[in-house]
Amino acid sequence: MNLSSLRLESNPRWSYHAAHFPAHHGLNPSFRRNFVSCSSIKPSASSSLSVAESFTRDSASRIESLSQVSGVLGSQWGDEGKGKLVDILAEHFDIVARCQGGANAGHTIYNSEGKKFALHLVPSGILNEDTLCVIGNGVVVHLPGLFKEIDGLEANGVSCTGRILVSDRAHLLFDFHQEVDGLREAELAKSFIGTTRRGIGPCYSSKVIRNGIRVCDLRHMDTFPQKLDALLSDVASRFESFKYGPEMLKEEVERYKRFAERLEPFITDTVHFMNESIAKKKKILVEGGQATMLDIDFGTYPFVTSSSPSAGGICTGLGIAPRVVGDLIGVVKAYTSRVGSGPFPTEILGQGGDLLRFAGQEFGTTTGRPRRCGWLDVVALKYVCQINGFSSLNLTKLDVLSEFSEIQIGVSYKQIDGTPVESFPGDLCLLEQLKVDYEVLPGWKSDISSIRKYADLPKAAQQYVERIEELVGVPIHYIGIGPGRDALIYK
């Protein structure tokens, strides 16, 4: 079936219809008529706001104007394309740092020759040979996975020697944490969270109940066996199917003796290093993993990750002061996707969702699982912008929408009885029963992947970008129009 001939219908639990929209959305009169129920009414090109003129600078000045400590954070449920922007920005920064999460954060980047790299722990700045990469204290580190990434990079000509620093305060994620992840999911049965089963939650659980093992513990092999024994014994007492005995402990200790020797050149007091670097005026770029809608506090709990992938996680995950953090860039897809379970108000079910999924190649970097897909949710995006205080946005995968004759944006929520919902709710019962009001915009039905100037985009594509800016109140400075490293428009 041709994409252009199909009108994608969102989840039937949420309705499209003309309705009163609360004033807090800041909609001007020329757009109110476009909140429709399965309608083909389209706004005229003349109603598009000319936001572009306010943000037209060349790419170099745009990047160089970023603050000394800047960050790139996910603005949806992950998989927005953060790694590509970090890779591009890294050329202008001395240090790229990860502050939270673990190998559940899959970032796909491409080098100048178009070779693909899928990274999970190593910061995306590694492809820039002049950049130092820091894995901060807030990250949980699976050493076999880290070494595998390093070996893969080295095998492809990317030098890692002296370029990766691992915090001595970071917690170690063991293979048995991954096993526990699967056991917990099996226990939860139908109410499972949809974890990547990379052991992230169990490792953070060990950290919080204070029986976790940190990188610095590898320097003390006289006490390491006792700490590991206590941790394994705790797991065995919790799960009957987890088999643990002296032989397993002996094997793990010997294994980690080898790991400790290999990791030693990378181990650093990164809190001291980061603050010294700030004092020396080094430029630092923080690479967030996952996204704010998966934040342990602000996401759709309990369908969230176990760390803080929002602005606050930068300070706690690196040990730097809030006052030194400057520009934060939110990365958001031109539509929305989500892996695993949890509420998804603008989800498109059935064949329509499949078409968007295959057009955008929406399959998880870490798990390979197909992602759920839907229209852009402006209510959720505004919520995320408020929490993080973004100075700008990077709109990615705009090219994926090129085949659609019309594009929808979820602009407000209401309860079943029509009562407006003024903000993104924390109550999942309410969130799962919401109706979404959509605004319909015209598609551009042309290939935009080779365009490099904003002014050269089709008017309908510009209108879509500018409408998002108007709705969320944050400028879009970067627009992704393909997976390649150069497929980026600076606005």
Swiss-Prot record:
Residues reported to bind Mg(2+) = D79, G106
Q: Does the keyword GTP-binding apply?
A: yes
Q: Which GO terms describe its biological process?
A: 'de novo' AMP biosynthetic process; IMP metabolic process
| GO cellular component labels | chloroplast; cytoplasm
Involved pathway(s): Purine metabolism; AMP biosynthesis via de novo pathway; AMP from IMP: step 1/2
Q: What is its main location?
A: plastid
Miscellaneous section:
This protein may be expected to contain an N-terminal transit peptide but none has been predicted.
Name of the protein in question: Adenylosuccinate synthetase, chloroplastic
Q: Which organism is it from?
A: Populus trichocarpa (Western balsam poplar)
